[in-house]
Amino acid sequence: CNTIVKRNNKWIGYNTDAEGFHNSLLEFLGTKNLKRWKVAIIGAGGAARAIAYVVKKLKGKACIFNRTLSKAKSLAQEYGFDYAPLSSESLSKLELYSSLIIQSTSIGLGVGEKEISTPENDPLSFYNFKGYEYVYDVIYHPQVTPILNRAQMSGCKTINGFNMLKYQGYKQFELFTGVKYEDS
């Protein structure tokens, strides 16, 4: 829950992650479904849960990669997805699920822009981008994380989490005011 609204003297909690991600993803990819996409979801926390929900809703096939395998397994089983450890031992599986790579961990948050990629600031430091991948990092500050920098240098289409945040804000505005926000 990231938004609380009082309705009829009761507090109701909402999570706007899924809607924010959904709208920004459709805008990024220019498609309304993921039927032909094999998606790697990096991480298994709260943002990953919303992302998995959206990927399933859009009929995508996904694999959840996480450092703690039990968390990856739990989230993957909830949505009927594959799962694997987030490490170089899963490289072949990552390559199978690499048409869209969604980075949802906090790794890379707060590092300097254009900082050299290391395992401490890039969860996929072991992966060599081929240039065909679409790479989405939910982090919006810095604007270019080490993973996005490497992906861009390889010719991948990339996006950070700013539009997800923007669409979450639109939904929160609607929840608070009862008026749908119109982007001008």
PLM ranges: what are they?
Residues 31-38, 130-131:
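Short helix-loop-beta connector
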Residues 36, 133-184:
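Adenosine-phosphate binding glycine-rich loop
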Residues 1-31:
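Phosphate/diphosphate ligand-binding glycine-rich loop within oxidoreductases
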Residues 15, 25, 35-56, 66:
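Glycine-rich adenosine-cofactor-binding loop
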Residues 82-158:
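Rossmann-like adenosine-cofactor binding region
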Residues 23, 27, 53-57, 77, ...:
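Short, well-ordered alpha-helices that flank and scaffold nucleotide-derived cofactor binding pockets
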